[in-house]
């Protein structure tokens, strides 16, 4: 119990240190007038300098630890440098824009909308639809929203610092988890390696990145907890801490349940697979009764995870039990080329491919003799099993989104690769101590080479962060902004005419970034893939299509008043041909790729040519507002 409390205290300390490093660094970066990343190499150059400084600092921290003095200071230094590495890798390239990777486009649009909703109110609500509980896990967005509300920062503007800070916190906690299990110097190596890979492949989705970097130590700890009844000389943790790791595994799964559904499902799948493999081995060795222990531990994990996950999932499940649900599984209706095949990162001819291949070989050699290796091997196999199941489920007209587990697979293999590199160097050093110096030099050079290329890999996402128009109507590259620069005028007009706060107004628009910047409710979401199943996306789309066949304002008002959902009172549209106003909507066409087909709905201008509507042009937009009853 004392060890568990000490570990918890170290995790809290790691979160505090990471938050402090991120806050100070991001504030310092924001105070300088930088050139835009796409048009200048200065930010990339400074990122490289910062990365080299952090990697050198970690090397020095490892030396201090090995010297046997100031070990608490060495741990603190390790937390500072892994945190600083994360911040400089993401924060420096984004230094001249207020937007995060991928700007306010596509997926980031609905994520920003969710953050805006939970900034406006702490209540757990759907991002778009009035009166519905959330379907997508709100954990990351709720905390970010509370930070935004506390600091008085617009949600869209807090997205970048919160994304970077949250990933930094996860990386720091990862270091703490590893140093609980392995030597501190090795914990530094595996943490910085997995952090770098996570930043490359998972950082555009910050809440997924947090779980991805935490998965390897969490799964190793879980495997140790499940196996704690066995008396093996090489197990990572002792038997007395077995139930502490079970509790920790339950907390991690519960955390994943409130954070990201797909990685929750994968982690649960992996833990169940671990339990079944262990129970089978115990049954063969000691009889059927021996299987009770891992099953009992699995039950404990499930109970803890379910209790935590219920905080965010219970409102939706309770509502879904009696309300109609449409487009069930639409979120899984996506099958890109990566989802149609198995990924083998260890076969890439690159630095990353080499470390993944080394990790694969280490797993094969050490699985039978190392708890770490066996845990990682099962986790890797679970990714491939999940991918095969995902391909098979296409027969049922859905998928398991296996392509989104490719960063997870890579991080697991890199984790194994670091352990393989360490053990290979140690084995060779028995014959010549100079091998350790050579290995250190190779490792440092490889780390610098891989890290400094991260901004290049992220360049497309970084470019969009500079070319999208932010909530102030400005672009990070200081070029003429897009039509979003008129959003402030639309917002002012809506507030003036309706006389209602934003969270009491439902808007129908195809320019969904308006809902990302301002906490209005939407009548229809971006696509069915992001829509709450309780919202009946398909029926709403059919209703909008029917309005295009109406001819008078009275018919439209009658149609609005008889809707089974809160009707829109604000319409943000574009001018169409032949005296019409247009909305460009989306339809799910899975299994085709692209999985979304855009179509245009033309609403006759005559529907709004009535004293009960206030209609005006604002930039390229047509704003039609249904006047309150007393003003009509």
From Swiss-Prot:
Residues in compartment: Extracellular: 455-632
Localization: Cell membrane
Topology relative to the membrane: Multi-pass membrane protein
Biological process (GO), any one: cell wall macromolecule biosynthetic process
Keyword Membrane: yes
Pfam families attached to this UniProt entry: AftA_C (PF12249), AftA_N (PF12250)
Disulfide bonds: none
Annotated EC: 2.4.2.46
Statement: the UniProt record of this protein carries the keyword Disulfide bond: no
Name of the top EC class for this enzyme: transferase
Main location: membrane
GO MF terms held by the record: glycosyltransferase activity
Alphabetic keyword roster: Cell membrane, Cell wall biogenesis/degradation, Glycosyltransferase, Membrane, Transferase, Transmembrane, Transmembrane helix
Pathway as given in its UniProt record: Cell wall biogenesis; cell wall polysaccharide biosynthesis
InterPro entries hit by this protein: ArabinofuranosylTrfase_AftA_C (IPR020959), ArabinofuranosylTrfase_AftA_N (IPR020963)
Ranges annotated as spanning the membrane: 10-30, 45-65, 76-96, 162-182, 184-204, 206-226, 242-259, 263-282, 298-318, 344-364, 375-395, 409-429, 434-454
Entry GO terms, CC: plasma membrane
Catalytic activity: Adds an alpha-D-arabinofuranosyl group from trans,octacis-decaprenylphospho-beta-D-arabinofuranose at the 5-O-position of the eighth, tenth and twelfth galactofuranose unit of the galactofuranan chain of [beta-D-galactofuranosyl-(1->5)-beta-D-galactofuranosyl-(1->6)]14-beta-D-galactofuranosyl-(1->5)-beta-D-galactofuranosyl-(1->4)-alpha-L-rhamnopyranosyl-(1->3)-N-acetyl-alpha-D-glucosaminyl-diphospho-trans,octacis-decaprenol
Functional summary from the UniProt entry: Involved in the biosynthesis of the arabinogalactan (AG) region of the mycolylarabinogalactan-peptidoglycan (mAGP) complex, an essential component of the mycobacterial cell wall.
Family: Belongs to the glycosyltransferase 85 family.
Name of the protein this chain belongs to: Galactan 5-O-arabinofuranosyltransferase
């Amino acid at each position: 119990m004392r060890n568990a409390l000490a570990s918890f205290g170290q995790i809290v300390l790691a979160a505090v240190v990471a938050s402090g490093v991120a806050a100070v660094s991001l504030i310092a970066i924001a105070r300088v007038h930088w050139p835009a990343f796409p048009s200048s190499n200065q930010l990339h150059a400074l990122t490289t300098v910062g990365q080299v400084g952090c990697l050198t600092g970690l090397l020095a921290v490892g030396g201090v630890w090995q010297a046997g003095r100031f070990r608490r200071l060495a741990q603190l230094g390790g937390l500072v440098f892994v945190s600083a590495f994360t911040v400089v890798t993401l924060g420096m390239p984004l230094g001249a824009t207020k937007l995060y990777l991928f700007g306010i486009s596509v997926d980031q649009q609905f994520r920003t909308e969710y953050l805006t909703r939970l900034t406006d109110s702490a209540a757990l609500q759907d991002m778009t639809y009035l009166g519905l509980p959330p379907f997508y896990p709100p954990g990351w967005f709720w905390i970010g929203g509370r930070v935004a509300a506390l600091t008085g920062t617009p949600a869209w503007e807090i997205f970048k610092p919160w994304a970077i800070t949250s990933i930094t916190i996860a990386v720091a906690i990862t270091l703490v988890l590893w140093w609980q299990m392995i030597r501190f110097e090795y914990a530094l190596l595996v943490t910085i390696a997995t952090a770098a890979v996570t930043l490359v492949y998972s950082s555009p989705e910050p809440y997924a990145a947090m779980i991805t970097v935490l998965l390897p130590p969490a799964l190793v700890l879980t495997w140790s907890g499940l196996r704690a009844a066995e008396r093996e000389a090489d197990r990572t943790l002792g038997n007395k801490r077995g139930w502490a790791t079970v509790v920790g595994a339950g907390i991690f799964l519960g955390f994943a349940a409130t954070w990201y559904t797909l990685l929750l499902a994968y982690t649960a799948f992996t833990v169940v697979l671990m339990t079944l493999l262990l129970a089978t081995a115990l049954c063969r060795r000691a009889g059927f009764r021996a299987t009770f222990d891992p099953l009992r531990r699995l039950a404990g994990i499930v109970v803890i995870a379910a209790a935590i996950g219920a905080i965010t999932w219970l409102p939706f499940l309770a509502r879904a039990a009696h309300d109609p649900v449409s487009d069930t599984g639409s979120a899984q209706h996506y099958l890109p080329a990566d989802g149609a095949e198995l990924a083998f990162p260890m076969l890439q001819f690159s630095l990353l491919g080499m470390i993944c291949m080394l990790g694969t070989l280490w797993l094969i050699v050490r699985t039978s003799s190392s708890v770490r290796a066996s845990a990682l091997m099962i986790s890797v196999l679970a990714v491939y099993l999940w991918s095969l199941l995902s391909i098979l489920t296409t027969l049922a007209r859905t998928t398991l989104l296996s392509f989104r587990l490719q960063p997870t697979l890579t991080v697991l293999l890199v984790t194994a690769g670091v352990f393989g590199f360490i053990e290979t160097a140690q084995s060779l050093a028995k014959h010549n101590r100079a091998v350790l110096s050579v290995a250190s030099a190779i490792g440092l050079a490889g780390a610098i080479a891989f890290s400094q290329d991260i901004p290049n890999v992220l360049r497309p996402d970084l470019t969009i962060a500079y070319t999208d128009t932010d909530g102030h109507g400005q672009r990070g590259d200081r070029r003429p902004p897009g039509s979003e620069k008129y959003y402030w005028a639309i917002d002012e007009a809506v507030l003036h005419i309706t006389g209602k706060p934003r969270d009491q107004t439902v808007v129908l628009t195809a320019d969904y970034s308006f809902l990302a910047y301002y906490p209005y409710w939407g009548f229809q979401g971006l696509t069915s893939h992001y829509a709450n199943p309780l919202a009946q996306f398909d029926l709403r789309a059919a209703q909008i299509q029917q309005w295009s066949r109406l001819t008078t304002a009275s018919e439209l008002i009658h149609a609005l008043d008889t809707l089974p959902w809160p009707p829109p009172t604000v319409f943000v549209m574009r001018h169409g041909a032949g005296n019409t106003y247009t909305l460009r909507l989306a339809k799910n066409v899975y299994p085709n790729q692209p999985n979304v087909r855009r179509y245009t709905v033309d609403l006759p201008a005559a529907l709004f040519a009535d004293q009960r509507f206030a209609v005006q042009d604002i930039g390229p937009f047509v704003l039609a507002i249904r006047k309150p009853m007393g003003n009509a």
